[in-house]
A protein has these predicted regions:
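Soluble, non-transmembrane catalytic domains of enzymes that act on hydrophobic metabolites at membranes
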Residues: 39, 45, 53-55, 154
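Glycine-centered loop/turn positions within well-structured domains
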Residues: 97, 148, 152-154, 162
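Catalytic binding pocket for nucleotide-activated donors in carbohydrate/polymer assembly enzymes
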Residues: 152-157, 168-170
Length: 170
């Protein structure tokens, strides 16, 4: 019986991917078949997501933003953002003052959103935690862990991230 339930579950996941793939590509958002993109997410046309990208129902993405193998949850992302491979934005938090950090031991936490403004470039393997605002035209270096807000036209990197430089327009 457990095997049958597991097979049925896999079949349902497969059909959900087909429906999601058709839904988003029809709306002008290009996703590849392996992506898991909620139909409740808000994604503008012109976006491209490839690989095993995951975009949850709590996400909002502006037009012409793209990414490969990205994980977007509890986040609002602006237009024309470049997300390098394996970027993670707005991951869930767990309480540290409970018996356990496992979700069975506490009530659901209301997650705070991350906000990524327009024209932001986020390097490979960067992580942007919940409740962080990244200003427009900023750059997040590869592998950075962003725990605090980033001003516009700022380059940050490191763990935790710190300001590396500012961007000056010519």
């Amino acid at each position: 019986m457990k095997l049958i339930k597991a097979i049925l579950s896999d079949i349902l996941i497969f059909y959900e991917r087909i429906i999601s793939y058709c839904y988003w590509n029809f709306k002008g958002v290009r996703i590849t078949f392996l992506c898991q993109v909620s139909r409740k997410a808000k994604i503008e046309s012109g976006c491209l997501f490839t690989g095993n990208s995951i975009i949850t129902e709590n996400a909002s993405v502006g037009s012409f933003t793209y990414g490969h193998n990205v994980n977007i949850n509890n986040a609002t992302i602006g237009e024309y953002c470049s997300l390098a491979p394996d970027v993670k934005i707005g991951l869930d938090e767990h309480p540290l003052d409970k018996e356990s950090t496992h979700p069975h031991f506490y009530k659901k936490i209301i997650q705070k959103k991350s906000i990524i403004s327009n024209h932001v470039w986020i390097g490979a393997n960067a992580i942007i935690l919940c409740d962080v605002i990244v200003g427009s035209h900023s750059v997040i270096a590869a592998g950075a862990v962003v725990t605090k807000n980033v001003d516009e036209k700022t380059i940050v990197g490191g763990i935790p991230s710190r300001v590396i430089n500012t961007i000056r327009n010519n």
